[in-house]
Each structure stands twice: as C-alpha cells, then as structure tokens.
C-alpha cells in the first residue's frame, strides 16, 4: 500500500511507519524496484514514530497495535481535515474504529465490507470458500472535543 500511495502522490510525499523489520526490508527493496523516491520509511510504532512527521493530508492505517484512538487523535491534531482510511478484519478492530468514528464526530464517514472467495477442488466440483471479509473505514473532518 505504501508504494502505491507514493506513486499516486506524484510530486507529494508519503511516509510509511512499520514496527517489524520483516516488513520494512521488502518495502525498501520495492522502493528501489519501482523507483519510488518520495517515500520515507520510519521504523517504530505509531503514534510515537509519527510525532515528528509533517501534517498529513491523507493517512492509511493498516494496523494499530492497539493504538488506534491515539493514532487518530495525533493525525487530527496535525490536520483536523486529514482523510483517514483504515482496514480491519478482527471484530476488536472493527469495534475500535466504530468507536473512533463516534468519539471524533467525523463529518464524513463510510464503511465498506469486501468479501473474497477462493475455489477449491472437491471431486468433480469447484466450490467457492469464503475468506475473511475486510472492512474499509474512511473518515474525514474529525473533532478532538
């Protein structure tokens, strides 16, 4: 997602925060592979790792290590009109994001659920087996009050 965000940013800049070295190494390799020069990779855990980053216009949250409300509060302090997109598959994450939508009273919200199914061989048939649905939350124009 970070590479795609940087590519879409054009002359803008993207930042990726990651706490796992196993994710950061391939990210650096993909920056070189796709000639992405407008992506800063920051090792660490949010919100602490993003404290010194500039105010974002957009933010993608692919995980929060249990810090979702703190991360969103920091993003809103930096830019009250930041557009936040967050994904969730666990019920706890879905509940936390729903609570954030209420707590920060966003002016614009949308939740989309995407379901995926894969075929599997079962004798002469190929039934489709459902995978975990993915919930995509989009929020903008929140308030810290």
Predicted segment positions?
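Short beta-strand element of Class I
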Residues: 11-16, 84
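Core SAM-dependent methyltransferase catalytic element
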Residues: 123-145
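Active-site-adjacent beta-strand anchor residues
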Residues: 17, 61, 87-88
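S-adenosyl-L-methionine
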Residues: 15-56
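Cytosolic regulatory regions of ion transport systems
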Residues: 38, 67-68, 91
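Short SAM/SAH-binding signature in class I
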Residues: 54-63, 83
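Conserved SAM-binding loop of SAM-dependent methyltransferases across substrates and taxa
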Residues: 1-11
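C-terminal substrate-binding/active-site "lid" region of AdoMet-derived donor-dependent transferases
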Residues: 73-130
């Amino acid at each position: 997602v970070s590479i795609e965000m940087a590519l879409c940013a054009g002359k803008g800049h993207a930042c990726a925060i990651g706490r796992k070295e196993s994710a950061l190494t391939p990210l650096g390799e993909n920056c070189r592979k796709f000639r992405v020069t407008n992506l800063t990779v920051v090792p660490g855990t949010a919100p602490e790792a993003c404290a010194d980053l500039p105010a974002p216009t957009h933010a993608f949250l692919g995980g929060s290590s249990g810090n979702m409300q703190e991360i969103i509060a920091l993003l809103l302090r930096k830019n009250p009109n930041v557009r936040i997109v967050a994904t969730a598959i666990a019920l706890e994450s879905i509940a936390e994001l729903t609570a954030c939508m209420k707590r920060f009273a966003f002016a614009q919200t949308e939740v989309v659920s995407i379901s995926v199914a894969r075929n599997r061989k079962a004798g002469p048939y190929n039934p489709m087996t459902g995978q975990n649905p993915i919930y995509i939350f989009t929020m903008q124009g929140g308030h810290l009050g």
